[in-house]
Amino acid sequence: MYNCAIILAAGKGKRMKSSMPKVVHKVCGKEMVNHVIDNVRKANISDVNLVIGKGSETVKEHTRDRNVTYSMQEEQLGTGHAVICAEEFLKDKKGTVAIFTGDAPLITNETIQELFEFHNSGKYAATLISSTVQDPTGYGRIIREASGEVKKIVEHKDCNEEELKVNEINSGMYCFDIEVLLNSLKNLNNDNSQGEYYLTDVIEIMKESGEKVGAIVVPYEEIMGVNSRVQLSEAEIVMRKRINHKHMVNGVTFIDCESTYIDVDVEIGNDTIIYPGCVIQGNTTIKEECTLYSNSRICNSIIESGVVVENSVILESHVGEGTTVGPFAYIRPETKIGKSARIGDFVEIKKSTIGDNTKVSHLTYIGDAEVGSKCNFGCGTVVVNYDGQKKQKTIIGNNAFIGCNTNLISPVKVNDNTYIAAGSTITKEVPEGSLAIARSKQINKEGWLDKKGLLKK
């Protein structure tokens, strides 16, 4: 059986009050439309078409790596019109098409699989996703036959007294037999107060033709649409709860899961402990037995097992097994830190490699450098990597001891087994086995205060 999907992503999203298309706003680090695409793919649906409109180039930019096709809806004339715009995608296809909305990011791949299985096994012409709610005010009601099949969808304003009591609502997500859908679209009209083509009218057309229509009921949170910043926040809360619950089930400890913010694609190993206020973003991987103390941010990075991070920022970097970072360290992109290293307080490292067992304990800047293993950086060391025009590289070998308040003027090389005296400004290569001293001699002028009349008696 051939299965495919259409995702409606052409809405303007006026209530978002944004210059961006609604569907590219993110929920837990991923664009809403990409949540839907990815869950469709997890349900083994490979052929996906996006109906786009206002801000189409932006939507394409955010979905270009998702291997989808696009249909253009120049004018937003309703959900039925959006599907009509995708007729070319459906042309000559036989099988089943599911239709989802790009602003409902909480739909799960399990529900999508259930939708296709229910639809295909029951040989329905159409299957709706519905939900039951305590207050259905404003929603279209699902009215069922005695057999359980769907009889019709009635908009709230058109409900009679009995229909108003129904609390099963329409989600706007469907499965259709492709041939029946295309034939029904030919009879779709815009004879309504809004002058729009509604996909719900297709259900009525099918029923009038004697077709079989079913529905599956899912939790309301799965069909929540996002039309405002308030609803975006509500979706974020639901998604975050799901994400954190998944990690806890897999053996991760959260001291306070309600104040821990983890993006949907983050991977975390078991026996890792995460304290409140941590933000873990992008395609980050945290291995086993790590400890992330409060107010740390990690983005698009790999953190190996046994790492401790305290009040620090790590961006697009790799931190080796057993290393400690922080407090108040800043690890900038393209940094690779080895095993059992120590990156201490107020240390900034940018685009550099730090070897195993190296200690950079405090108040140090390292940029565009290769640093070997078992080195020690004294407090106040600066790798001076910028000459005013471009960044230069510094190379430091193994077992180098860098004294406090040292300036390493790039490009420069410090070889293995070297010492640099505190307060030095190094501009030339330091040979292996050497002690480098590059500072002015101390001069004591005896009696100077008395001569200047500054001596206090």
From Swiss-Prot:
Residues where acetyl-CoA binds: 385-386, 422, 439
Enzyme Commission number(s) from the entry: 2.7.7.23, 2.3.1.157
GO BP field: cell morphogenesis; cell wall organization; lipid A biosynthetic process; peptidoglycan biosynthetic process; regulation of cell shape; UDP-N-acetylglucosamine biosynthetic process
Region of interest (Pyrophosphorylase), residue spans: 1-229
Region (Linker): 230-250
Entry cofactors: Mg(2+)
UniProt keyword terms in alphabetical order: Acyltransferase, Cell shape, Cell wall biogenesis/degradation, Cytoplasm, Magnesium, Metal-binding, Multifunctional enzyme, Nucleotidyltransferase, Peptidoglycan synthesis, Repeat, Transferase
List of residues binding UDP-N-acetyl-alpha-D-glucosamine: 8-11, 22, 73, 78-79, 140, 155, 170, 227, 332, 350, 365, 376
One cellular-component annotation, GO: membrane
GO MF, one example: glucosamine-1-phosphate N-acetyltransferase activity
SUPFAM superfamilies in UniProt: Nucleotide-diphospho-sugar transferases, Trimeric LpxA-like enzymes
Pathway(s) of this molecule: Nucleotide-sugar biosynthesis; UDP-N-acetyl-alpha-D-glucosamine biosynthesis; N-acetyl-alpha-D-glucosamine 1-phosphate from alpha-D-glucosamine 6-phosphate (route II): step 2/2; Nucleotide-sugar biosynthesis; UDP-N-acetyl-alpha-D-glucosamine biosynthesis; UDP-N-acetyl-alpha-D-glucosamine from N-acetyl-alpha-D-glucosamine 1-phosphate: step 1/1; Bacterial outer membrane biogenesis; LPS lipid A biosynthesis
Active site, UniProt feature: 362
Annotated positions binding Mg(2+): 103, 227
Keyword Coiled coil: no
HAMAP family in the record: GlmU
Record NCBIfam families: glmU (TIGR01173), PRK14354.1 (NF010934)
Biological role stated in the UniProt entry: Catalyzes the last two sequential reactions in the de novo biosynthetic pathway for UDP-N-acetylglucosamine (UDP-GlcNAc). The C-terminal domain catalyzes the transfer of acetyl group from acetyl coenzyme A to glucosamine-1-phosphate (GlcN-1-P) to produce N-acetylglucosamine-1-phosphate (GlcNAc-1-P), which is converted into UDP-GlcNAc by the transfer of uridine 5-monophosphate (from uridine 5-triphosphate), a reaction catalyzed by the N-terminal domain.
PANTHER family: BIFUNCTIONAL PROTEIN GLMU, NUCLEOTIDYL TRANSFERASE
Protein name according to UniProt: Bifunctional protein GlmU
Species of provenance: Clostridium botulinum (strain Loch Maree / Type A3)
